[in-house]
Structures are given as structure tokens and as C-alpha cells.
Swiss-Prot record:
Name of the protein in its database record: 2-isopropylmalate synthase
Function: Catalyzes the condensation of the acetyl group of acetyl-CoA with 3-methyl-2-oxobutanoate (2-ketoisovalerate) to form 3-carboxy-3-hydroxy-4-methylpentanoate (2-isopropylmalate). Complements an E.coli leuA deletion.
Region Regulatory domain, residue ranges: 490-616
InterPro entries: 2-isopropylmalate_synth_dimer, AIPM/Hcit_synth_CS, Aldolase_TIM, IPM_Synthase, LeuA-like_post-cat, LeuA_allosteric_dom_sf, LeuA_N_DRE-TIM, PYR_CT
Organism: Corynebacterium glutamicum (strain ATCC 13032 / DSM 20300 / JCM 1318 / BCRC 11384 / CCUG 27702 / LMG 3730 / NBRC 12168 / NCIMB 10025 / NRRL B-2784 / 534)
Keyword Magnesium attributed: yes
Miscellaneous comment in the UniProt entry for this protein: C.glutamicum strains classically bred for lysine production are leucine auxotrophs.
A family per Pfam: HMGL-like
Subunit structure: Homodimer.
Region (Disordered): 1-34
């Protein structure tokens, strides 16, 4: 069912809340109690524990450097796909991650499937892993799986063996049916076995990573107990630290509580100077990015995630969003996003999942303004940027290369689209919610017309009349067609055939004009005189019973070169009706005269009602 077909009538199963209001609920809050089964769910402090950290320090921290990144698209992301990656798609993803600058890449769970095993062997045997890139392989804390993992990695230069077991209250009780002692022993036994087996593969630089899976559902004191025991077995040093990964396997709490738990571990873990503290946030509550940022401020050193937030359920934390959030704060993410469209295209191909239009930084619509006030602010912001490097210039008169080193300050655009390989063509799009700013921007950037501010309201009303009548969006071509129909193509009641202008030769002499016209279907020739070509033409039209008073005039070059064109805009009161006219021609003079004719026809065309300037 398409979105357009989805709403037929109000769904019968939705029950409008009519229950009692909360005790103490203020009178201005009209919400009512719902029939949702709230009694089935426990708050985090009851389900797990109430983490108390009154002297927390993370709220005062700032993110000033990027973390160590680890991309888990090829494992955690891949396992969540409807159609898991083929070997060819895995290669494409791996090559993309390397090209972007990731130095730690989780490449699979080689003991879990032959496909993953074969892929790990392929990238090792074909020399696809750069010397400064470390591959990471995932394995459960079981002996036969651990041995198979080492077999898969034989011959690799740098490998992180990532072993894990779940430590949460729920999984201990429901899945494994083990007590705390048994769960801890499972972890330490795996650590001892891994350390022993690694001795059989001396040519590889082995590093270790342990995750108390479902960390967010684990009491922090117990998580520390298990982690400390594993660290004691692996015996890391400050020169050769191990990674302790604290996964929000299921996001269960608000980001501030997650940050408290990270800071608690950061403060209390034994041998902290020999530990790289890592985060692995998921997005079940929709706050994975916030949790990662606050957790990083709370003492973490490293973050695992996926491009565009792929992963089980609602996905892993989005590394694109995290990294580009840092860029907007002047922090180098140490990853390259200069062609985000290519990155997105590759990810969509590999995952066979579309990146939503509203996904931060990468979606089709994230740099697009439809709202009139937003469009006006963006338009003015871009012009202000241009004026910084060339006083008085508009955004169409200054190249992006000239702006490249200028501080970015444009309302509603937290990042310059061109810094990530996007362009300005789709920054402003017009629908029924748009205003003069958006219309003016498109006419300026796409069609070279700098519509005067006082005319922008009039033309935006013309465009809005179309969107109100027809619905949907008005693209650039459609907008030009509307403009041409409204201002350039009218030939009734006056059509210009030929104009001969003689400019004044002295200060006290008038300009003169001879105008060959078709007026109400008849060929006519009229003469006029005035203190300039426009006044002379108005005088000529007066002889046809057309009273024209020029009230505002603007002009500019539309194009340059041998075929240069000029554009002129005239606000005129024609027989008591105030309208704008527009002319485009090879010279300013003839463009201006065309603009007067345009205004006359818009005011007097009985077959086509014009939008009047200023509502007159």
C-alpha cells in the first residue's frame, strides 16, 4: 500500500484517551490517561538498578577530538539484513570503509558461517587489508568457535579477537540459566583459551576485545567484576592495551543514564590505563547518537557502529551522523565524507536497504527547505556568505571555491552541503508551504533572475496559486514555465512588433520612440516623447488610452558573453492597477521596454487575471 493509499478512514482500533489525568497535572495540560498497558513495563531503576553518580563530570566535558572508530557493517550490520551481503557486496563495503579512513573494521563472525569464514580468508589471501588497518572478528566464548576463529585469521597482520558473553540479569535468568559465578567463569575461561591458542599463531599482531553483552541490562558492580576478571587473565599493559566494549545491546535508558554508567566504569575499572574503553550503542529508543556522544564525554575512547545506522531492530548507532556532528563543531572526524552521495549509494547497494530521505546528512531532503521563512533565511544567509568575500555580491556571483575557507554561517543549514559533495540545487524546493525566499532563490540560482524584493511577494503568490490548485512540488522547470507565462509571453492587449528609440542628445532634450504594435488585434504605430525611453514609451501608450506610471525600476545582466542578456523589472500603475512587468532582451533598453509591455498586459488582459502588486 502506497502512502497515498494508506489513509482511508480513521483506524477503528485507535482509542482516543479519555482516562483520568495525572495527579497534579496542570490545568493547561489537557492530555488524558490512555488504555496503553503501562503496568507491563518496569522503569530501568526497577528492572536493572538505579545508578547513582551525583558527582558526575561528563556534563562539563566537550568533544574536541574524534574517537577511535570501528565499523561493524560487515558483521553486526550484515546479520540484520533481509538479504545478507554476497561476497561481492562484502568486498565493496570493505573497500569503502578502508577508503573512508576506518582503521578498525569488524569483518565477520568466521566461526558462525562458512560465508564469513571464506570472506575473512579472501581479504587476507588477496592482500586486501592495508598494513595500518586492523580487522576485527567476533566470537562467542566457546572453545570450538574460538579455535575456528584463529584458523580463519591465519596470515593476517593485525587482528582484534572480539569475544563476548551476555551478562545481563534477563539473559542470565532466562537464556543461560546461570548464576553470576558461572557467567563470569564463562568469560574468564574464554580469555584463557584465547591467550593460549594465540601462541600457535606468532606471526599475527593479536589484540583482544571483550564485551559484557547486554551491558545496559547488567548491574554495573557485576559488570566491573566480570571485566576485571577478564582483564586480569589477558594481562594488558599501557603499551599494549585491550579493548573493553560496553554495548547498549538493547537501548533501555536515556542517554544521560547510559553516560553515568560509562563514567562509573571509567572511574572504577581496574588497570584503566591498560584499557581502551569502547561503546557499542544501539538505537531502540531512538537516542543512539545522543548516547554515544554523552558516553564518549563520560570517558570512552572508541565507538563501534554502522554507516547510516544499519543493524538489528532499529539499528546500531550511525557513524555518519556521529562523525559529521563532530565536523559541525569544528572537530576533524578523521574520516572522509567529501562524496556522501557515493557513500550512500554504495551502502544502499551493499545493504539492499534505502537510506531514508530524512536521515541526517545523507538523506535526499536533509538540506532542503520547503517552508517560506526557512527559504528566505537560507537565501539571505548564502548572500551574506558571498558578501564576506566580495562586498555587495550575491551568492550567484561568488564561486564555492572563493567561499571554501570562510566560516559557514547559514540559517537552517548546520553544514555546507558542498563540504559533503552535495549541491545547492535541492537546498530550496517549492510547494504550497513555500514563500518568496524560496521562489527568489530558485529563480536566481537556476535562471539568473534577481527578482526585486518588492516583486518577490507577487511572484510567490502566483506560484502558490499553482501549488494550491494542483498540489505537490513546483520544480525549477515548472517555476520557469509559470514565470514565462505570467510575465514574458502575454501578447494581449499589446504586442510589440518593432520599437525605434532615439535617446536625448543633450541635457534638455527628450528621448523619442516610435512603437509598432498590435493593440486589441489591430496594427498601430504610435510615437512618444519623454525624459528617457521608458517615459517616452509611456507617452506613446497614452495615445492608446493606456495610462502608465512607472513607480519602480530594476535591471541587471542575466548572462555574459557574446549572447549576453539583460533583465529589467518595472513596477507600474496601469489604468489604476499596480503590477510588475518583466522584460528580457539583448540590451537594457529593450529589456526595459518589454517590461513595460509586460506590466500593461498583466494589468489589462481580460482573459488572464494578474496577481496585483501590493494587493491593489
Amino acid at each position: 500500500m502506497s502512502p497515498n493509499d494508506a489513509f482511508i478512514s480513521a483506524p477503528a482500533k485507535i482509542e482516543t484517551p479519555v482516562g483520568p489525568r495525572n495527579e497534579g497535572q496542570p490545568a493547561w495540560n489537557k492530555q488524558r490517561g490512555s488504555s496503553m498497558p503501562v503496568n507491563r513495563y518496569m522503569p530501568f531503576e526497577v528492572e536493572v538498578e538505579d545508578i547513582s553518580l551525583p558527582d558526575r563530570t561528563w556534563p562539563d566535558k566537550k568533544i574536541t577530538v574524534a574517537p577511535q572508530w570501528c565499523a561493524v557493517d560487515l558483521r553486526d550490520g550484515n546479520q540484520a539484513l533481509i538479504d545478507p551481503m554476497s561476497p561481492e557486496r562484502k568486498r565493496r563495503m570493505f573497500e569503502l570503509l578502508v577508503q573512508m579512513g576506518f582503521k578498525e573494521i569488524e569483518v565477520g563472525f568466521p566461526s558462525a558461517s562458512q560465508t564469513d569464514f571464506d570472506f575473512v580468508r579472501e581479504i587476507i589471501e588477496k592482500g586486501m587489508i592495508p598494513d595500518d588497518v586492523t580487522i576485527q572478528v567476533l566470537v562467542q566464548a566457546r572453545e570450538h568457535l574460538i579455535r575456528r576463529t584463529f584458523e580463519a585469521c591465519e596470515g593476517a597482520k593485525n587482528v582484534i579477537v572480539h569475544f563476548y558473553n551476555s551478562t545481563s540479569i534477563l539473559q542470565r535468568n532466562v537464556v543461560f540459566r546461570m548464576d553470576k559465578v558461572q557467567v563470569k567463569k564463562l568469560a574468564t575461561d574464554a580469555a584463557e583459551l584465547i591467550k593460549t591458542i594465540a601462541q600457535d599463531y606468532p606471526d599475527t599482531n593479536w589484540r583482544w576485545q571483550y564485551s559484557p553483552e547486554s551491558f545496559t541490562g547488567t548491574e554495573v558492580e557485576y559488570a566491573k567484576e566480570v571485566v576485571d576478571a577478564v582483564v586480569e587473565v589477558m594481562d594488558p599493559t599501557p603499551e599494549n592495551p585491550m579493548i573493553i566494549n560496553l554495548p547498549s545491546t538493547v537501548e533501555m535508558i536515556t542517554p544521560n543514564v547510559y553516560a553515568d554508567s560509562i563514567e562509573w566504569m571509567h572511574r572504577n575499572l581496574n588497570r584503566r590505563d591498560s584499557i581502551i574503553l569502547s561503546l557499542h550503542p544501539h538505537n531502540d529508543r531512538g537516542t543512539g547518537v545522543g548516547a554515544a556522544e554523552l558516553g564518549y564525554m563520560a570517558g570512552a575512547d572508541r565507538i563501534e557502529g554502522c554507516l547510516f545506522g544499519n543493524g538489528e531492530r532499529t539499528g546500531n548507532v550511525c557513524l555518519v551522523t556521529l562523525a559529521l556532528n563532530m565536523l559541525t563543531q569544528g572537530v576533524d572526524p578523521q574520516l572522509d565524507f567529501t562524496d556522501i552521495r557515493q557513500i550512500r549509494s554504495t551502502v544502499e547497494y551493499c545493504n539492499q536497504l534505502r537510506v531514508p530521505e530524512r536521515h541526517p546528512y545523507g538523506g535526499d531532503l536533509v538540506f532542503t527547505a520547503f517552508s517560506g521563512s526557512h527559504q528566505d533565511a537560507v537565501n539571505k544567509g548564502l548572500d551574506a556568505m558571498a558578501a564576506k568575500v566580495q562586498p555587495g555580491a550575491s551568492s550567484t556571483e561568488v564561486s564555492w571555491e572563493q567561499l571554501r575557507d570562510t566560516e559557514w554561517e547559514v540559517p537552517y543549514l548546520p553544514i555546507d552541503p558542498k563540504d559533503v559533495g552535495r549541491d545547492y540545487e535541492a537546498v530550496i524546493r517549492v510547494n504550497s508551504q513555500s514563500g518568496k525566499g524560496g521562489v527568489a532563490y530558485i529563480m536566481k540560482t537556476d535562471h539568473g533572475l534577481q527578482i526585486p524584493r518588492s516583486m518577490q511577494v507577487e511572484f510567490s503568490t502566483v506560484v502558490q496559486n499553482v501549488t494550491d490548485a494542483e498540489g505537490g512540488e513546483v520544480n525549477s522547470k515548472a517555476m520557469w514555465d509559470i514565470f514565462a507565462t505570467e510575465y514574458l509571453e502575454r501578447t494581449a492587449p499589446v504586442e510589440q512588433i518593432a520599437l525605434r528609440v532615439e535617446n536625448a542628445q543633450t541635457e534638455n532634450e527628450d528621448a523619442s520612440i516610435t512603437a509598432e504594435l498590435i493593440h486589441n488585434g489591430k496594427d498601430v504605430t504610435v510615437d512618444g516623447r519623454g525624459n528617457g525611453p521608458l517615459a517616452a514609451y509611456a507617452n506613446a501608450l497614452e495615445k492608446l488610452g493606456i495610462d502608465v506610471e512607472i513607480q519602480e525600476y530594476n535591471q541587471h545582466a542575466r548572462t555574459s558573453g557574446d549572447d549576453a542578456e539583460a533583465a529589467a523589472y518595472v513596477l507600474a500603475e496601469v489604468n489604476g492597477r499596480k503590477v510588475w512587468g518583466v522584460g528580457i532582451a539583448g540590451s537594457i533598453t529593450y529589456a526595459s521596454l518589454k517590461a513595460v509591455t509586460s506590466a500593461v498586459n498583466r494589468a489589462l488582459d481580460v482573459n488572464h487575471e494578474a496577481v496585483l502588486a501590493g494587493g491593489v
